[in-house]
Each structure stands twice: as C-alpha cells, then as structure tokens.
C-alpha cells in the first residue's frame, strides 16, 4: 500500500526579508529575554518596569576623575525635571567597597548620608539639593555591592545551578539596579529619565 504525501503538506521556509520594518524575529528575542532564567541569557525585568518607556542618560569621565560629572549630571537632571519629566539619578562607583562609609575622606571626600542611612558619595548631596528630592539606597551602588548581591543570589540558588559569570550575571545585576530605579522613579511616579553617573575612571 502506497502512502502518498501531498505537496501541500511540506512547507518551504520563508526567506528572510530585506524590509527593515519586518519584525519576524522580535517575538523570539522578546520571549528569550523574558524566559532568561531557563537559558544562558540573564536580563531580569523587575515588577513595574515598562520596556521602552524609560530613557537613560549616561555620564562618564573616561580616564579622568574629578571633572565635575556630578554637577553636570545633576544640572541635566534639573533641566529635565523643570520640563515636567520625572527623573531618577544614580551614582555607580567602580570600587569594591560596599559603600563609601569606610573610605578615607582625604582621598575620596566627605561621606554623604541619605535619610535611609546609606553612606554614599558627595554627588548624591548635589542631586538632592538640585532636584529637591530625597534619595534612597536605590540611587547609589558600587561594584562591591553588585558582586555581593550576585554571590548572595548564587548561594540561594537563584541562578538555577549555572556557572556564574561576568556576562550575563554581573551585567544582569547592573540592569536590574537600573530597571528597579526606573520603576521606582522619584518614589511617587516611575522615572521618565534615569541619569546614570559612573564614578571614577573607565
């Protein structure tokens, strides 16, 4: 007995489109990013975060420190706030200390203490004065704090037994920090713009 297969049962793959507006692969990428805990990708999306809603302004000092990045970043934030946007500044320090509390003030400057007790960089005092806004621990982080949180998550099994690496896990925690701040905003509304100042040198 011959079993015939009709030509219509075989589908030929659709060739890739040259149209830049074709979104054939965007759904696949989106679903992969959101299911990141089950793949080698890790790009956490915190509650309240809306993709495409928040904008980011990054302020770097390249190979020099003490250029006035804090004044510049807070001035940009003030101008945006005066235009009616909700802004959320964050200072990201490259050092491995958990916070600024134990740093030598002669080398680093005076420590600024936020209302919630966070010991941080003086630039956060500039942000608070310029924006007339009380900041929290969400507005300050260091490499040491990020590494500490990565290791704590690994000990709790949050990475599902995978080998923890710089990419995607450490970079994923940086994304988490920025996205959580974007969702939190000024404490009342989510941020339209997140101002990211990267301290020190890159």
Question: What are these model-derived regions, one by one?
Answer:
Residues 1-202:
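Flexible phosphate-sensing "switch/lid" loops adjacent to ATP/NTP-binding sites
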């Amino acid at each position: 007995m011959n079993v015939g297969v009709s030509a219509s049962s075989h589908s030929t793959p659709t060739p890739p489109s040259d149209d830049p507006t074709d979104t054939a692969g965007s759904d696949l990428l989106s679903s992969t990013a959101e299911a990141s805990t089950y793949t080698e990708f890790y790009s956490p999306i915190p509650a309240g975060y809306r993709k495409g809603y928040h904008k980011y302004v990054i302020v770097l000092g390249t190979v020099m420190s003490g250029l006035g990045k804090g004044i510049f970043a807070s001035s940009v934030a003030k101008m945006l706030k005066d235009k009616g946007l909700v802004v959320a500044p964050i200072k990201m320090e490259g050092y491995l200390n958990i916070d600024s509390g134990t740093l030598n003030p002669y080398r680093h400057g005076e420590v600024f203490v936020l209302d919630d007790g966070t010991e941080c960089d003086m630039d956060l005092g500039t942000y608070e004065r310029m924006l007339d806004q009380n900041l929290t621990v969400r507005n300050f982080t260091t490499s040491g704090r990020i590494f500490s949180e990565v290791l704590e998550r690994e000990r709790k099994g949050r990475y599902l037994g995978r080998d923890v690496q710089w990419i995607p896990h450490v970079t994923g925690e940086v994304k988490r920090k920025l996205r959580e701040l974007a969702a939190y905003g000024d404490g009342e509304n989510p941020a339209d713009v997140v101002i990211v100042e990267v301290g020190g040198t890159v």
